[in-house]
Amino acid sequence: MSNNELLEIEPMYLQFPFELKKQMSCSLYLTNKTDNNVAFKVKTTNRNNYCVRPNYGLILPKSTCKVLVTMQAQKEVPSDMQSFEKFMIQSVLASPGVTAKEVTREMFSKESGHVVEETKLRVTYVCSTTTNITSSPRTRRGFIFQCFC
């Protein structure tokens, strides 16, 4: 659970089952904790690797929005099954009467004087149930594993 005043974010990390040459998805739930409309925007450090739907929008008071994050098919296993990619959820109070189509980039601009809450989420990979763990491992900080999909 997040410490934001506007949104409760679940989960606080994005966990993708990993299989080579397959798109994988996970869900993110954004809950508006306020009595006002809240606009949100999802950003990532690697836009080419992920598809986020919706990547921005408006959440009505005390409502929840499901965001689907899809990782594009990977051609090789990441080193040590580690990801250094991150996501950031930005949220702001929206004026009454604003619709989802009226959510703009400027609403998330701190330079324009808007109060923007930001929450960073890490990406983790887990071996899928079809993944085999072998005895010729890669090691890192005492963990030994290698996944083949």
Curated annotation (Swiss-Prot):
InterPro entries: Ig-like_fold (IPR013783), MSP_dom (IPR000535), PapD-like_sf (IPR008962), VAP (IPR016763). The modification N-acetylserine is found at residue 2. Disulfide bonds: none annotated. GO terms for cellular component: endoplasmic reticulum membrane. The modification N-acetylmethionine is found at residue 1. Keywords: Acetylation. Pfam families: Motile_Sperm. Residues 6-126 form the MSP domain. SUPFAM superfamilies: PapD-like (SSF49354). It comes from the Eukaryota. May play a role in vesicle trafficking. Belongs to the VAMP-associated protein (VAP) (TC 9.B.17) family. This is Vesicle-associated protein 3-1. It comes from Arabidopsis thaliana (Mouse-ear cress).
